[in-house]
Amino acid sequence: MYRIRVFGDPVLRKRAKPVTKFDDNLKKTIERMIETMYHYDGVGLAAPQVGISQRFFVMDVGNGPVAVINPEILEIDPETEVAEEGCLSFPEIFVEIERSKRIKVKYQNTRGEYVEEELEGYAARVFQHEFDHLNGVLIIDRISPAKRLLLRKKLMDIARTVKR
């Protein structure tokens, strides 16, 4: 199992590098990430959240775990909805985030094969949230400065726990 990196850890702000090797090490890392995600009752976990600056994440929105490697968002539906999101890197913080209701995506599986699919609702939301992590974008970047200010003390408390 991995240790979850929390707000204040520099790896969360980096743009992750593409995956180039689809080998047993990648598969083992993904298995460990899935185990970690389930242990913390998450529905998604991006590689940067466990200290790995590479472009992949795992998610499970009720249909079993999926590994998403080198993802792209091909189309974003202009229709959006606001819903509450949490994040394993922000313990006990939940914020309202506006995201597209439907997206068309492309990614690679653990064999390096390309997968294209359309996601909607909760699956689209989780994909967009994890995709943000790969670009160094966090949930607090998607809320207003006023809301961020209200969370300032909690954020400072979380950042203080980071081992440097």
Curated annotation (Swiss-Prot):
It comes from the Bacteria. Binds 1 Fe(2+) ion. Fe cation binds at C87, H129, H133. It catalyses: N-terminal N-formyl-L-methionyl-[peptide] + H2O = N-terminal L-methionyl-[peptide] + formate. Keywords: Hydrolase, Iron, Metal-binding, Protein biosynthesis. Its EC number is 3.5.1.88. Pfam families: Pep_deformylase (PF01327). One of its GO terms (molecular function) is peptide deformylase activity. InterPro entries: Peptide_deformylase, Peptide_deformylase_sf. The keyword Zinc does not apply. The active site is at E130. One of its GO terms (biological process) is co-translational protein modification. Its cofactor is Fe(2+). NCBIfam families: pept_deformyl (TIGR00079), PRK00150.1-3 (NF001159). Belongs to the polypeptide deformylase family. Removes the formyl group from the N-terminal Met of newly synthesized proteins. Requires at least a dipeptide for an efficient rate of reaction. N-terminal L-methionine is a prerequisite for activity but the enzyme has broad specificity at other positions. This is Peptide deformylase. It comes from Thermotoga sp. (strain RQ2). The lineage of its organism: Bacteria, Thermotogati, Thermotogota, Thermotogae, Thermotogales. The gene is def.
